[in-house]
Amino acid sequence: MHGPRETLQEIVLHLEPQNELDPVDLLCYEQLSESEEENDEADGVSHAQLPARRAEPQRHKILCVCCKCDGRIELTVESSAEDLRTLQQLFLSTLSFVCPWCATNQ
């Protein structure tokens, strides 16, 4: 600064725009050690993968038809969403229900 007030030329001495045509190398050249396993248990906590906890079962109401008399059957099941999907696949294939009346009379 050469006077009582600074000027823009004194503050900004040299600015050049970045050349956007030159590629920037973003690769990491870090090399890992030969051992695949690292023992990082200094705090006494094991960081091993634990199996996922199963979802809590929920109740589902299923309305279906008797395969003999076409009567309405209402079922209530308690299962996880995954098991309910399996049951749905059985319904779409060969599983059929028989109502209590048809089961005892035929």
Swiss-Prot record:
Keywords: Activator, DNA-binding, Early protein, G1/S host cell cycle checkpoint dysregulation by virus, Host cytoplasm, Host nucleus, Host-virus interaction, Inhibition of host innate immune response by virus, Inhibition of host interferon signaling pathway by virus, Interferon antiviral system evasion, Metal-binding, Modulation of host cell cycle by virus, Oncogene, Transcription, Transcription regulation, Viral immunoevasion, Zinc, Zinc-finger. GO terms for cellular component: host cell cytoplasm; host cell nucleus. The keyword Zinc applies. A motif (LXCXE motif) lies at residues 26-30. Signal peptide: none annotated. GO terms for molecular function: DNA binding; DNA-binding transcription factor activity; protein domain specific binding; zinc ion binding. A motif (Nuclear export signal) lies at residues 84-92. It is found in: Host cytoplasm; Host nucleus. It comes from the Viruses. The keyword Zinc-finger applies. Highly phosphorylated. GO terms for biological process: DNA-templated transcription; symbiont-mediated perturbation of host cell cycle G1/S transition checkpoint; symbiont-mediated suppression of host innate immune response; symbiont-mediated suppression of host type I interferon-mediated signaling pathway. Residues 33-43 have a biased composition (Acidic residues). Belongs to the papillomaviridae E7 protein family. The E7 terminal domain is an intrinsically disordered domain, whose flexibility and conformational transitions confer target adaptability to the oncoprotein. It allows adaptation to a variety of protein targets and exposes the PEST degradation sequence that regulates its turnover in the cell. Plays a role in viral genome replication by driving entry of quiescent cells into the cell cycle. Stimulation of progression from G1 to S phase allows the virus to efficiently use the cellular DNA replicating machinery to achieve viral genome replication. E7 protein has both transforming and trans-activating activities. Induces the disassembly of the E2F1 transcription factor from RB1, with subsequent transcriptional activation of E2F1-regulated S-phase genes. Interferes with host histone deacetylation mediated by HDAC1 and HDAC2, leading to transcription activation. This is Protein E7. It comes from Human papillomavirus 45. The lineage of its organism: Viruses, Monodnaviria, Shotokuvirae, Cossaviricota, Papovaviricetes. The gene is E7.
